[in-house]
Structures are given as structure tokens and as C-alpha cells.
Regions:
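Catalytic-core regions built around general acid/base machinery
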Residues: 158-166
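Acidic, Gly/Pro-rich loop/turn segments at junctions of secondary structure
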Residues: 147-159, 174-181
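Short beta-strand segments enriched in small/hydrophobic residues
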Residues: 39, 44-49, 84-99, 199, ...
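N-terminal helix-turn-helix DNA-binding module of bacterial transcription factors
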Residues: 1-87, 360
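Bacterial carbohydrate/catabolite-sensing allosteric modules
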Residues: 1-26, 71, 112-117, 165-171, ...
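Amphipathic helical "hinge" segments at domain boundaries
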Residues: 59, 72-139, 143-147, 227
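Short beta->alpha connector loops
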Residues: 127-130, 151-156, 274
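Short hydrophobic/charged patches on amphipathic alpha-helices used for structural packing
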Residues: 80, 134-137, 161, 197, ...
Length: 361
């Protein structure tokens, strides 16, 4: 039995005609350098010079070639050009979780700077799945990317380690890396955690819990910062750590566990803003008012943190600045692969909003 038929309709925007072949059926063949040369009345080699941006072409001939290319709808063959130049001007960015606003906002800064350096960005989403990570990196390598950015992902698999050995790579948010020629961009996560706990202690809180993000070294460093700060304030007996998974749902589940204890915490420091929003949801579900009954602090200062009615107190790590820093490191390493590995650490700041207040009892 034959399968169901599928009808496909293609709609073109007004003012743009679908190129068709001379017989009227299907798209016409793609124009070639030869077609551009014939239309402009120049040689194929001169067309190649113009398309490569060579300065050794008169302005008159350059404009003639560009005009012919526009009229024909010619697009240079990126694969062929990369074989000639030895570069594709492509960068592959592999992201642990595109649902996390921090990663999306980081990519804004990364793409902005890469574009200024003449590089184009390809993005893959691993969804925290090691198999997806390997597949995405292999796809990037098949496209002969000039460089890799691993965001929230440590190169631990054989595929990723091998890739970093011959492809310029920058890792963001992971510190536990001992690979030559790999640059790192991180936030001072321990300092950020201490800022959060100091703020809560100043408000009179003692029973301060932490929901730990378990999927990255950043999460571990934030937890260590929490532990150090609690002990420094002589609050070790009140330490409470609940495991989370860096999502709103994970924050809700962890918060339910914490907030049904007796005595319950009066404040929660969450691994990131997404987890903190899950905490807010759990508090509302249990009839707790924020900040009157419970203070909540997130981490990242994503755009969601400042939205109403959330108004989340959070630790700001400059996401776009981190993206720009990663782009600079990568561009430098593409130009000089033999550079010594470098680490760029940004300094976080506490942003106080309405989700924190004085401890009640």
C-alpha cells in the first residue's frame, strides 16, 4: 500500500520571483562564476579576485562584477572558497541548554563580536545529553568550522577532547579542564555565592538553604561559596543543601522538599534564576509570601529576573561581556593556535530587588 501523498505549497514574498528553468518546470540551475564572467564581460579569474575582496582590481571592473552577480542571483560556493582559503569563517557554538536565558543572552554578545571579526555563528543544543554533544561537534567538524565554543559543557568525551586538539576552542562556565590550547571564560562563582549569603545574613536570616546545580563546575563552585560563607558567619548548623537540575521544575521540586521541613528555611539561594523562579512557584503553592515569609536569591540576572511581578534579587554575571570575551579569545586563537591557554574570569555583582527582605522570627 502506498503511503499518504503530501502536497507542498511554496509562497514567495511579493516582488520576488521564483527562478524557473527555461522549460518552465522547477528551479533554474544555479548561476556559476562562468555566468557572472560572461555577463560582466571579464575573465573567471577576475571574478574570483573580486569575490575574494582582492585590492588588485579596478573599481570599475569590481562594480561590473558585483552588478552581474546581483542580477544573476549568484552566491559564492562556500565549500570551494574554504578549500582555497583554508578557512570557512564559521564558528560552532554548542550549548548545554538553550532554554536557559543565560545561554541565549551570552550568545548575543558572542555573535555580535564574531560578526565584527567576519565570522558566522552556528548553534547546536545538546540538552545535557553527551550523545547529542558528540553528534553536534562531529557535524561542526564536518562543516570545517574555524573554531568551537562550548557553553556549559566540559570537553570530557573522546570526541570533544579530540576536537579541541586541532580546532581552536573556548570553553565557557567550566573550570575543570586540563587541555592545552583551550581557553576558558568563567564567572567568579564562589564570590557570587558569598555576596548572596552576606546579603541574607545582613537581613537577619540564619536558616539559609541552597539549591545546588549539579551539572557543571559552576554549580559546584557556587555551592562551595555558599558553604564557606555560612561557616564564616558561624551558621554551619543551619546549612541545608538540596540537589536541583538547573531548571524551573527542578527548583520547584527542591523547594518543596526544603519548605516542608520543620523548621523550614527562611531564605533560599538558588543555583540560577530558572531554579529561583521554580522556588517562587513552590512558595506560592505552599501559601508562603515572598519576601515576608521567604527570601529568594537567584544567579545570572537574566531578563526574567527583572520582570514583573518576579522582581528577583540575583547575582549578576555579565553575560554579553562574557560572550564578547569568548569571541576575542577565539579570534586570537584562530589567528595563533599555538598561544598558551588563557582564563578570563569576570566579577559578579549582587542586584537587589523585591524577593529578599528581613527575616521574620
Amino acid at each position: 500500500m502506498s503511503g499518504p501523498s503530501v502536497n507542498t505549497t511554496v509562497t514567495r514574498a511579493r516582488g520576488f520571483a521564483e527562478p524557473v528553468s527555461p522549460d518552465g518546470f522547477g528551479p533554474r540551475p544555479r548561476p556559476t562564476i562562468r555566468n557572472v564572467a560572461e555577463r560582466a564581460g571579464v575573465s573567471k579569474s577576475l571574478v574570483s579576485l573580486v569575490l575574494r575582496g582582492s585590492p588588485h582590481v579596478s573599481e570599475h571592473r569590481r562594480q561590473a562584477v558585483l552588478q552581474a552577480a546581483r542580477e544573476l542571483g549568484y552566491r559564492p560556493n562556500a565549500v570551494a572558497r574554504s578549500l582555497v582559503e583554508g578557512r570557512t569563517h564559521l564558528v560552532g557554538a554548542l550549548v548545554a541548554d538553550l532554554h536557559n536565558p543565560f545561554y541565549a543572552e551570552f550568545l548575543d554578545g558572542l555573535q555580535e563580536s564574531l560578526h565584527g571579526d567576519g565570522l558566522r555563528l552556528l548553534i547546536g543544543n545538546s540538552q545535557w545529553d553527551p550523545a547529542f554533544e558528540d553528534e553536534a561537534v562531529e557535524a561542526f567538524l564536518e562543516l570545517r568550522v574555524d573554531g568551537l565554543v562550548l557553553l556549559g559543557i566540559a570537553p570530557t568525551s573522546e570526541t570533544l577532547i579530540e576536537a579541541t586538539g586541532y580546532t581552536p576552542t573556548v570553553v565557557v562556565g567550566e573550570r575543570d579542564i586540563d587541555l592545552g590550547g583551550v581557553d576558558i571564560v568563567v564567572d567568579d562563582d564562589q564570590l557570587g555565592a558569598r555576596l548572596a549569603i552576606d546579603h541574607l545574613v545582613e537581613l537577619g536570616h540564619r536558616r539559609i538553604a541552597h539549591i545546588e546545580g549539579t551539572r557543571s563546575s559552576s554549580g559546584r563552585f557556587r555551592c562551595e561559596g555558599y558553604l564557606v560563607a555560612m561557616r564564616r558567619h558561624a551558621l554551619a548548623p543551619y546549612i541545608m543543601v538540596e540537589q536541583g537540575d538547573c531548571t524551573e521544575e527542578g527548583g520547584m521540586l527542591a523547594a518543596r522538599s526544603l519548605l516542608t521541613r520543620d523548621p523550614r528555611p527562611t531564605a533560599i539561594f538558588a543555583a540560577n534564576d530558572a531554579v529561583a523562579i521554580g522556588v517562587l512557584a513552590a512558595a506560592a503553592e505552599l501559601g508562603l509570601r515572598v519576601p515576608e515569609d521567604l527570601s529568594v536569591i537567584g544567579y545570572d540576572n537574566t531578563h526574567l529576573a527583572g520582570a514583573q511581578p518576579i522582581s528577583l534579587t540575583t547575582v549578576d554575571q555579565p553575560r554579553r561581556a562574557m560572550g564578547r570575551s569568548a569571541a576575542t579569545l577565539l579570534s586570537d586563537r584562530i589567528g595563533d593556535p599555538g598561544k598558551t591557554s588563557r582564563l578570563r574570569q569576570v566579577t559578579p555583582e549582587l542586584v537587589v530587588r523585591r524577593s529578599t527582605g528581613p527575616a521574620q522570627g
